[in-house]
């Protein structure tokens, strides 16, 4: 590379060493910056919507936690401004651990909801099919009590036929839920 003799003083400036890795400039569009800022603001809104127990499971520093707790108490326009501040605070930090913890919380909730739907369907099959469904439950949960299941099913059928409240059906669901939790 040719250097003009008058430009030698540029070599003496600290931090101006030639480095081929630093020559590449990463250009980010203004729209992309805005999209990232909006995504972080949405992440902040999700954090504000969480309860105290869920917030305790997410790694937040004191400033961010205080801003989130304040936003939970504020209404209307002040809340919007506070969400803007939370987005700004998130831009100054690495949001990846926060997003990961939030995803785990959501995934855990979704898994629990899916398990409950599965148990409800199993309960309905137990009431409608009887012994065939009992053998399926015993295959899934070997430590289940066959006699207790049969008694609950018999009572649930009586309640259904008598148009009574489904007390035994709820008990079947509770029993299946305890079996599923014990199985984990």
Swiss-Prot record:
One GO CC annotation: cytosol
Bilayer-spanning residue ranges: none
Region spans: Disordered: 1-21
MF terms (GO), sorted A to Z: ribosome binding; rRNA binding
Transcription regulation among keywords: no
Domain of life: Bacteria
Any single GO BP term: assembly of large subunit precursor of preribosome
Short name of one Pfam family: DarP
Keywords: Cytoplasm, Ribosome biogenesis, RNA-binding, rRNA-binding
UniProt cross-references to Gene3D superfamilies, sorted A to Z: PSPTO4464-like domains
Keyword rRNA-binding (UniProt): yes
Function: Member of a network of 50S ribosomal subunit biogenesis factors which assembles along the 30S-50S interface, preventing incorrect 23S rRNA structures from forming. Promotes peptidyl transferase center (PTC) maturation.
Stored PANTHER family: UPF0307 PROTEIN YJGA
Protein name from the UniProt record: Dual-action ribosomal maturation protein DarP
């Amino acid at each position: 590379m040719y250097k003009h003799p008058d430009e030698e003083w540029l070599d003496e400036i600290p931090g101006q060493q030639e480095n081929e890795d630093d020559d590449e400039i990463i250009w980010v569009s203004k729209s992309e910056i805005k999209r990232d800022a909006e995504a972080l603001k949405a992440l902040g809104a999700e954090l504000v919507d969480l309860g105290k127990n869920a917030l305790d499971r997410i790694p937040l520093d004191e400033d961010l936690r205080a801003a989130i707790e304040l936003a939970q108490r504020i209404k209307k326009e002040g809340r919007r401004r506070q969400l803007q501040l939370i987005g700004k605070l998130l831009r100054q930090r690495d949001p990846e651990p926060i997003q990961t913890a939030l995803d785990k919380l959501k995934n855990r909730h979704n898994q629990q909801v899916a398990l409950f739907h599965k148990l409800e369907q199993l309960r309905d099959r137990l009431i409608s099919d009887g012994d065939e469904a009992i053998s399926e439950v015993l295959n899934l949960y070997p430590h289940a009590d066959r006699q207790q299941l049969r008694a609950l099913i018999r009572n649930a059928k009586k309640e259904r036929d008598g148009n009574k409240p489904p007390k035994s059906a709820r008990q079947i669901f509770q029993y299946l839920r305890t079996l599923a939790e014990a199985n984990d």
